From Swiss-Prot:
Hydrolase recorded as keyword: no
Record's bilayer topology term: Multi-pass membrane protein
Taxonomic source organism: Salmonella typhi
GO function terms (MF aspect): transmembrane transporter activity
Name under which the protein is recorded: Uncharacterized transporter YdhK
Subcellular location: Cell membrane
The organism's place on the tree of life at top rank: Bacteria
Family matches, as PANTHER family: MULTIDRUG RESISTANCE PROTEIN MDTO, P-HYDROXYBENZOIC ACID EFFLUX PUMP SUBUNIT-RELATED
Species lineage: Bacteria, Pseudomonadati, Pseudomonadota, Gammaproteobacteria, Enterobacterales
Keywords: Cell membrane, Membrane, Transmembrane, Transmembrane helix, Transport
Transmembrane segments: 23-41, 46-65, 72-90, 94-113, 120-142, 157-179, 362-381, 385-404, 411-433, 438-455, 462-481, 496-515
Gene name of the record: ydhK
Similarity-based family: Belongs to the aromatic acid exporter ArAE (TC 2.A.85) family.
Keyword Transport annotated: yes
One term under GO cellular component: plasma membrane
């Protein structure tokens, strides 16, 4: 007994925490209920209800609601498209094939073009149409089209309802609590990030930390969406939460700007590091106030009016303190449940994002070509299991066109299908042939699914494999009503599914997604185009919108293995963002002195000469940097205080642009170019 006790403790059932048990039981009961209800509703393929319940098994209430709404909308759209296409083209195989391939290719483009629920809905509409329409090629009566379509949609809705009901019975962590906790943690992490970036060193760890902070803030936007659906309180506070995310992005920009000034400041005060550490320690306290912070940073107040570098750093540091204290106060009010009208915060739109249209179109073309090749082969050889291959190929192309590593995902799916083929053969022809009642089969499924759900949570490295095994198990076991046990059909169908995924893998290998270097160049060019727009009199993006758009560009390569492409995308984003903040500050800067106003306009025109959508002009850049330095030195000796403030702003612009002196040549990102990883 002593020997067996440690072994029992290492089993997934004894290792599981209460939260893991709640998650596993909730999802397992939902899947079993979905299968049961689909059977009693006499739906012909009830396993789709079980699969639908597995797909919407999100760990939070808001995630389940938002995912369910997207799934219902996508299923209805896909079913409608399948009915229209099949109803008009079913007697013409080639027209049917091209129409379906075009629709699923369009859905692939759309899910890459949009984000969150809209992207998920288009994903569902693409492979729902494939699930419904491709098996229709074997039907004889046209009236069966409606029966098949409504059965698939009903099965999906049954699974969603069961998943939602179990989430209400066994609820998990509140989305609002998760969002507020993430906001508070990020608020505290920004101080640690400031302490790291304001060091004089330049290492890869700084660049990685900057990318990590940007990615985490943008990820919190997904938590905001889930909280929006989970509780009416967060729907009322949605604009405020958006503003908080923008403020955290602005704090990140200010930290980067202060770092750039410290690196370009020849003689900073000797006590600057000591004062900064005291400041960060005070800001980390829950009850930090403006008076105490002002006393701490007072030793850094510039004494020489002509020292524009010191003045620029001082003004930006004060702005950072004010913004951080304001965010702390607003976070406290939101967490304490204060009424919306008592929280004085500037309402801002949602975070902006950029769509790589070239990559989205290429993904749609790849899907169209893949389905056309498989369909042509099926028609040419009269392959009865061709619909199965087409369905899995459609699912693979739609799902993995937007992931960072499609080959890894497709290889994992292939591994899943092989394992499920072997397992489903044993279950179907070893167990199910001996079962006469549904409850007997559920007695087998329940402990199996509970164990698989627990293993998915306890084995993070294999979570993707366990998740796919759970989702695809229903379609491989194929629990139909009435049950069918035909070994030849079983073998052909499973082979077709594996072949469909294999051809999809081949399509990704031939019609490869753009390399990270190519994507980086496209993002950099889009950044420059948007920045040139910022220099116009009436820019299309506000300061906050351009900031969030820039950070969205930077985050697109956060998982890339091409360090050079990531580094230059981050550098361009930081440079253009710092320059845009200076431009907006120059616009807001006013003086009664007409010569000073003309100097301000000259600085903005110098930026237009340096920057274009295609590249940065190196000769004008060097001349511009010299001219900006000359302007700063001249204004420093001006008798008006406004001139000193203008010199400080222009020096910030000089610090930001100096990073581009080693920019790579147009259209290249070659490792041969000298680059320093200064984030």
């Amino acid at each position: 007994m002593k020997l067996s006790l440690p072994a029992l403790r290492n089993t997934p059932w004894f290792k599981a925490t209460s939260g893991q048990w709640r998650y596993a039981l909730r999802n397992t009961i939902a899947m079993c209920l979905a299968l049961t209800f689909a059977y009693y509703l006499n739906l012909d393929e009830p396993y789709w209800a079980m699969t639908s319940a597995a797909v919407v098994s999100f760990p939070t209430v808001g995630g389940v609601i938002s995912k369910s709404l997207g799934r219902i909308a996508g299923s209805l759209l896909g079913a409608t498209a399948a009915l229209i296409i099949a109803g008009h083209t079913l007697n013409e195989p080639w027209l049917f094939l091209f129409s379906m391939a075009a629709w699923i290719g369009f859905c692939t483009w759309a899910c890459a073009h949009f984000t969150n629920n809209a992207a998920y809905a288009f994903q569902l509409s693409g492979y729902t149409a494939a699930i419904i329409a491709f098996p229709m090629v074997n039907i004889v009566e046209i009236t069966q089209l409606w029966d098949i379509a409504q059965a698939r949609v009903c099965e999906v809705i049954v699974g969603i309802l069961c998943g939602g009901m179990m989430m209400m019975i066994l609820p998990s962590t509140s989305d609002g609590t998760a969002l507020l906790t993430a906001l508070k943690n990020m608020h505290a992490r920004l101080l640690e990030h400031a302490s790291l970036l304001w060091q004089p060193e330049t290492t890869d760890a700084i660049r990685s930390a900057h990318e990590g902070v940007i990615g985490q803030i943008l990820t919190m936007n997904l938590l905001r969406i889930q909280a929006f659906w989970s509780h009416y309180r967060f729907r009322r506070q949605n604009a405020l939460l958006n503003a908080l995310l923008h403020q955290q992005l602005r704090l990140t920009s200010v930290i980067s700007s202060l770092r750039r000034m410290l690196l370009n400041w020849p003689t900073p005060p000797e006590n600057s590091r000591e004062v900064i550490e005291q400041l960060l320690a005070e800001l980390a306290k829950p009850r930090a106030d403006s008076y105490t912070v002002a006393r701490i940073i007072a030793p850094l107040c510039p004494q020489d009016e002509q020292d524009y570098r010191h003045l620029a750093f001082w003004q930006r540091l004060r702005y950072f303190c004010q913004l951080y204290l304001r965010s702390s106060r607003q976070l406290y009010l939101i967490e304490s449940g204060a009424p919306v009208d008592q929280i004085h915060i500037r309402r801002t739109p949602g975070l902006a994002r950029h769509t790589d249209n070239a990559e989205a179109i290429w993904s749609g073309v790849r899907t169209f070509c893949t389905l056309t090749v498989i369909g042509a082969w099926s028609i040419g050889v009269q392959w009865e299991s061709g619909p199965g291959a087409l369905t899995l190929a459609a699912i693979s192309c739609v799902l993995y066109s937007i992931v960072a590593t499609p080959f890894k995902s497709l290889s994992l799916l292939m591994r899943t299908l092989v394992l499920l083929s072997l397992f489903s053969f044993v279950v179907k022809f070893g167990l199910m042939v001996q079962i006469t009642d549904l409850w007997q089969f559920l007695l087998f499924l329940f402990p199996l699914f509970v164990t698989m759900q627990l293993l998915k949570l306890q084995m993070p490295k294999l979570a993707g494999l366990w998740g796919q095994l759970i989702v695809f198990m229903g379609s491989f076991i194929a629990v139909t009503n009435p049950p069918v046990y035909d070994f030849a059909d079983f073998l052909n169908d499973n082979t077709a599914k594996i072949v469909g995924v294999a051809i999809s893998w081949l399509a990704f290998a031939i019609l490869r997604p753009g390399s990270d270097a190519v994507k980086s160049r496209r993002h950099i060019r889009a950044l420059r185009r948007d920045f040139v727009d910022q220099l116009s009199r009436h820019p299309s993006h506000s300061e906050s919108e351009f900031e969030s758009l820039t950070y969205h560009h930077v985050s697109q390569l956060s998982n890339s293995q091409d360090a050079l492409a990531r580094r230059w995308l981050l550098r361009w984003g930081v440079v253009l963002l710092n320059c845009s903040h200076v431009v907006w500050q120059l616009r807001a800067w006013e003086s009664r002195s007409d010569p000073l106003s003309r100097v301000r306009d000259i600085c903005i025109s110098l930026l237009r000469d340096v920057m274009s959508e295609r590249d940065v002009q190196q000769r004008p850049l060097a001349v511009t940097l010299q001219e900006l330095q000359r302007i700063c030195d001249t204004l420093a000796h001006h008798h008006q205080p406004a001139a000193h403030e203008l010199a400080a702003i222009i020096w910030r612009l000089h610090c930001s642009l100096s990073q581009l002196e080693q920019a790579p040549a147009q259209g290249t990102l070659s490792p041969g170019y000298l680059m320093t990883p200064q984030a």
